[in-house]
């Protein structure tokens, strides 16, 4: 019984920070830490000079809100090459996930039709291309199915998902084929 009790003096000394501990953390200003050179810290309080990444970029751009629709993971990147797709597929196979192809003809972007509440499920249901590729061990098998699906439905968007059958969840999803621009 006595071994499970702690005195309040012990708790107070553990939770109290000493002045030496409070000054050990170097300040961080902007995008570059000044911890290595404490004497060179700027004393200028001008708001335009607070954020700096060493002068490499003068202005950061934001995603344009008009004309560019958001699709899935990696949609902010340029279209993936065959080699990049193969690496993504190899990654999901290496993780033990089951590759599966899905396609959508009308609304491949984030679109709410059946439900208006925010969340992971946005009301989109994609059509599965054949069956999930159980036992698939090679990315070229998935790429061959992707090529067949894109020939069958050339105006659709096709995505590859990685499904974890142990946890019963979809772990990865990305657009693998976009139709040519009209």
Swiss-Prot record:
Keywords assigned by UniProt, alphabetized: Calvin cycle, Carbon dioxide fixation, Chloroplast, Photorespiration, Photosynthesis, Plastid, Transit peptide
GO MF term (any one): ribulose-bisphosphate carboxylase activity
GO cellular component: chloroplast
Main subcellular location of this protein, as a coarse class: plastid
Transit peptide: 1-58
Disulfide bridge positions per record: none
SUPFAM superfamilies: RuBisCO, small subunit (SSF55239)
SMART domains given in the database record: RuBisCO_small
Location in or out of the cell: Plastid, Chloroplast
Protein family: Belongs to the RuBisCO small chain family.
Note: The basic functional RuBisCO is composed of a large chain homodimer in a 'head-to-tail' conformation. In form I RuBisCO this homodimer is arranged in a barrel-like tetramer with the small subunits forming a tetrameric 'cap' on each end of the 'barrel'.
Protein name: Ribulose bisphosphate carboxylase small subunit, chloroplastic
Species annotation: Fagus crenata (Japanese beech)
């Amino acid at each position: 019984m006595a071994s499970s009790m702690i005195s309040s003096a012990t708790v107070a000394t553990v939770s109290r920070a000493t002045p030496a501990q409070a000054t050990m953390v170097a300040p961080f200003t902007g995008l570059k830490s000044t911890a290595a050179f404490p004497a060179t810290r700027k004393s200028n309080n001008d708001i335009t000079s607070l954020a700096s990444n060493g002068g490499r970029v003068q202005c950061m751009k934001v995603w344009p809100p008009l004309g560019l629709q958001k699709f899935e993971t990696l949609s902010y990147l340029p279209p993936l090459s065959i080699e990049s797709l193969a690496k993504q597929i190899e990654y999901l196979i290496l993780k033990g996930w089951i590759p599966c192809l899905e396609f959508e003809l009308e609304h491949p972007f984030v679109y709410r039709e059946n439900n208006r509440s925010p969340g992971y499920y946005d009301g989109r249901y994609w059509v599965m291309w054949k069956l999930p590729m159980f036992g698939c061990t090679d990315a070229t098998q998935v790429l061959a199915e992707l090529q067949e699906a894109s020939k069958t439905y050339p105006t659709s968007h096709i995505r590859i998902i990685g499904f974890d059958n142990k946890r019963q969840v979809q772990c990865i999803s990305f657009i693998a084929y976009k139709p040519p621009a009209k």
